[in-house]
Structures are given as C-alpha cells and as structure tokens.
Amino acid sequence: MADRQRALLLGAIALGALALRLSHQWRWALWGSDSGEYLFLTAALVGEGALLQDGYLGWGRAYPWFQGMQILAASAALLCGTPLPATLFWLIPAAGALAVPALFLAGRRFVSSDAALVGCGCYAVAFPVVYANSHAMPGGLADPLGLLLVYAFAGVLAAPRRWAPPFSILLLGLLLMHHFTLLLAVAGCTGMLALETAAGSRRRAPYFALATAAALTALYWIGYATGFRTAILGDTGLPLGVLLGAPLVALGAMRLLAPRLPLPSLQAPRRPARLFLGAFLASLLIIGYGIVYDVPGTSIPVGPDAVPFLLPPLGWLALAAAPGLVLAQRGGWLLYGWTLPIVGLAAVGGLTGSHLLIAYRHAPYLMAPLALMAGAGFMALLRMQTPPHRPRFAASLASILLCGALTAYPPVAVMGGFQEGTTNAELGCVLWTGQVEPGALIVSDHRLSSLAFGLGKHNASWEQGADVLVSAGIVREVSTPAAGTQEVGYVLLSDEVRAGVTLLQWEAAQPLSAEAAAKFDSATYSAVYDSGRCQLYRQAPDSLM
C-alpha cells in the first residue's frame, strides 16, 4: 500500500473512532458515571485558580491528585471562552481518540505499517476501549500518552540519547494524568526491556530510564499525593518501604536474570487459518466460563446476552493467536514484552480479588498490543490469498469491524446493570437539588451521587448509602466517603436506579426489591421534586416520626 493511501486510511479510521466515541453524547443528557466529580474539580480549578486537593469530599481518592485532565479542560475553556461542562464532556473523549494515530506510530516499532494500520482499525472499534474512553475521564485522555510512552521507550532501547527526552516528557504527562495508565505503560516497558536483554542487549540506558521513572513515580505517589498514598497503603497492606523499594529491586533482579532467559524459536504456521479458527472456538469456552463463574475478580455475570457483543472483538482477536507470525515481525518479542506484564497484573487482580488491580480494567490496555498482533496475523493470511480473492478477504475483516462498531456500546443488561448515561429527567432532578439547604446529605447510587455532588454541590453517599436504598427499613445515618457520618437528608431515585442500583465496581447492579421501593411511598419520604421518571425525596427526621 502506498504511503498516501495508508495516510488517508489512517485518517478515516481516526475520524471513525472520533465519531464512535462521541456518538453517545447526543443520546444522553450526560454520559459518564463519574462526570459530576470531574466537573466539580474542573470548576474548582477555574473558580479558585488552584487545584483542590486537601479537604476534597468526593468519592475518588485519586482524583484530586491526578488533575491533568482538569488542567487541560479548564485551560481550553478559559482560552476559547466555551462553557466549561461542554468543554470537559466533548474535548476529553475527542482528544482520547488520538490514541488511534498514537497506536499506529507505536505499532510501526513492532510490525509492518500495513499490519499496524489493520491493528488501528481493530482497536478503534473494540468495545472495551470505546466504552471505557467515550466519556470524560483521565484514563481516556491518558491513553494516547501511554501508547506514545511505549513508542518512545522502544526508541530508548535502540537510541537512548535521542529518545530519552521524549520519554521523560511523556512520563511527566502521565504522572499528572492517570496513575493506572502509567502503571501499565511502565509495566509494558519493563517487559520489553526484559526480553530485549534476553535477546542479547547490554545497554544500561534503558534501565536508567525505568529506574528514573520508578523514582519519579514514587516521589509523586508517595511524597506528593498524600491522599493517594494513604489509599495505596490501606488497600495493599504493604509497608511504605516495600512499595518504595520493590520497583528498584525488580529492575536489579531483571538485570541479573534476563540475560539467562531463553527465547524459544517458533516457526510461523503453514496453515494459520486453522489456528485462528481454533483460537476463536476456544474463546467461546472462555465466554462460557464467564457465564458460569462471573467475570474474574468480580461478582458480575457475563450472561448469554453478552455473546453478540463479544463475537466481533473475538473474531479479530483470534488473528493474534499465532506466536510464530508475531515473532516474525521486526519487533515481535518486544510486542510480547509489552503484553505479558499487563496479562500478569490482570491475572493477579483476578486471582486475588484485588480492588486496585480489578481484572476487567486491564482489558482496554491489552487491546492495543493484541490489535497489532491481529494486524500481523491478518496480513499473513492476506498474502496467502490469490490476488483476485484479496479484496473479498479484506472486506470480510471490514464487515467484522463494522459489526464491532455497531456493538461498541452494549446495553445495561450486558454491562452488569451499570448505567453510564444520565437522562434529561435525572439531570433536571439533580439540578433542582441546588435549592436544597446547604449541608444536607443526598443519598443515591454511584452515578447520581456523583452528579448530586458535582452539579448540586451537596455531600453524597455513593456506595455507602446502600442500606438506605436497598433495605426495607429506615436508615437514619450514613458514613460518607470523606465527610464523616451524616444524617440522611434526601434520597434521589430514578427509574434507572430502581432498575439497577450501581454501587461497587466489582458487584453487579441489582434492582430495588418491592419492599425497598415501597418504603418511599410511606410518610417518612415526601417527594419535594418529581420530574416524572426521577424523584427527590426528603426523609423526615427521626424526631418527627
């Protein structure tokens, strides 16, 4: 394929990815379950001219300490004179779509340009990527930076002096933006270095680059982001010294052991189509596991309704199942070095039930290297076709990707009952909470709590108000995430919340029981605002009962 054709096709894929990520902005009043908190922090930055960190009363313990997204959105709104909510909710997912050209740049380090282009097409419609990054969130904006960090580190492996400055700049950007993206990007770089060392490289500069990255990350996470440090120490149960020393010890051990790591020589299969078909059928068994045993590390069932939405990504992921074809590429081993640490961290999260390394959160990050592997597999199959049959063969992949685009937003029932979209009725009810007396606690599920906090400027309950919502009895007090124990003032309910109360990330949303729903018709709860499909109830104080 000529360079001009390749550039035009990449542009078309990037525009398609942009349109796909923004498509749900037209379907909902707001899209994104944490939008309220992000808007609250961004508005505080614009209004006060300083980052709100200490004393933050929201749910996200990491949000105040990683405000790169808020800085970008606030700067754009001030410079362009655009409304802050529109700037945040449209600019961030649009900027996140730059991950597609970023993947193409990174992909050319590992596979051919055509294979990287095919990988971009797969990545652009992968529903774990689209769904996760289609709303304003730091992870979506950090996605292009993470891919570019991998790209720069591949350059550090070959030409350290030239690529160390870009690597450092991207590292600093990720430090400000998103901790989880930084963790997985650096983990991928570490895996690449391990296999590069096993292949015979003795350069010291890449080790210095990763040691510097580990030191800067430790300084930021442990030294500066005090609230985040408390969360890490509490969730892991590890001593501070272990967290500080573990990355450097791991790098030292890798420096000693990686040269002794044997790299097997794998031949490219003569009939890869059979291997790809077998991989696709095996993936169906994995779906069956999810139906029987839930998503690893969670209590969220997959369910047979998810099968139509999983088939398109599984169709192209099967093309990544030929290691011999991948290793025949210019950077095949490096590509596996990028992938395997992410797989390992996901496995740890799934096996231990860790709430820091939730297994399904790794899926969007795995899609990038796997898409490049799939691109290599597809190009190998394409070359095996006779010239007259190649257009039809390419059209078959295009049809799979089109199906992927059409199924990139699974319904609530498929997503464990989790609802990312906010209706006009819910938004109107949330905005009305601005008339509620200051200091009153509003109880709702995770999504509406975020909006009541961010738009209504009220303390909210998030998952800690579960008993107020789901129990048949009356609950008077709630322990909030950061504002201490407070008396319940109001309860915010909508038809969507009644259909599925979203609480913890690792538990499926459950509908309100008939007994729990009935109590809101009692004298204890009076509807002070009713938009038809969303109600704000005032809970009577105990002294009045």
Predicted regions and their residues:
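Transmembrane alpha-helix segments characteristic
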Residues: 14-16, 208-216, 266-298, 327-352
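Extracytoplasmic
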Residues: 101, 109, 139, 376, ...
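Active-site lumenal/periplasmic loops and adjacent helix-entry segments of GT-C-fold
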Residues: 6-147, 152, 360-365, 415-422
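Transmembrane signal-anchor helices characteristic of membrane glycosylation enzymes that use polyprenol
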Residues: 3-33, 216-224, 282-287, 403-406
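Membrane-interface transmembrane helices that cradle and orient dolichyl/undecaprenyl
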Residues: 147-163, 192-201
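Hydrophobic/aromatic-rich transmembrane helices and adjacent perimembrane loops
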Residues: 183, 308-319, 354-386, 534
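Membrane-interface alpha helices of multi-pass inner-membrane proteins
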Residues: 163-179, 190, 211-222
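Hydrophobic, aromatic-rich transmembrane alpha-helices
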Residues: 193-194, 247-292, 311-331
